Design a protein with these regions (language model features):
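Sequence-structural signature of mature extracellular/luminal beta-sheet repeat domains
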Residues: 1-140
């Protein structure tokens, strides 16, 4: 079973065929100060496993999809709400980590590997917005 662990065996879950809804019993609050951020009536789903670590989610409401970075695997992934499928949006991503949309709906990303901030245009081309500050390269 993909991603099997002690919680999967205990709860008889199979991540290949289903999604677990909140409250997710396998989510453990390690730092008690975080508990105040848990909203009892808010939904939470695990939509993907397989990232070494993930961050930088950016929601594209008009297209009903979510982009996020899988930094060590050097890719940006895309989850589509309609189908629930996950695909690669961009690889290599130059280890992009922070992502956000601009006012025109384009993706802005901070690239760790190239030490630059880029904008992905609607046609998929990538343009550099910034790669230095006061003649010094960005630091990450």
């Amino acid at each position: 079973m993909v991603g099997e662990n002690k919680f999967d065996r205990h709860l008889n879950r199979n991540w290949e065929t289903g999604v677990v809804s909140y409250p997710e019993p396998a989510v453990e609050i390690i730092e008690e100060s975080f508990r105040k951020y848990v909203i009892g009536n808010a939904g939470m789903e695990r939509i993907y496993t397989g990232c070494r670590w993930a961050e930088g989610p950016a929601w594209f409401g008009d297209g009903r999809y979510l982009l996020w970075s899988d930094i060590p695997n050097n890719r940006i992934l895309r989850w589509t709400e309609e189908t629930g499928s996950v695909s690669e949006f961009r690889k290599p991503s130059n280890n992009a980590n922070g992502n956000v949309r601009d006012r025109e709906g384009r993706l802005i990303s901070c690239e760790h590997l190239t030490r630059r901030v880029t904008r992905t245009e609607h046609d998929g081309t990538v343009n550099v917005i910034a790669d230095s500050f006061r003649n010094f390269p960005l630091n990450s």
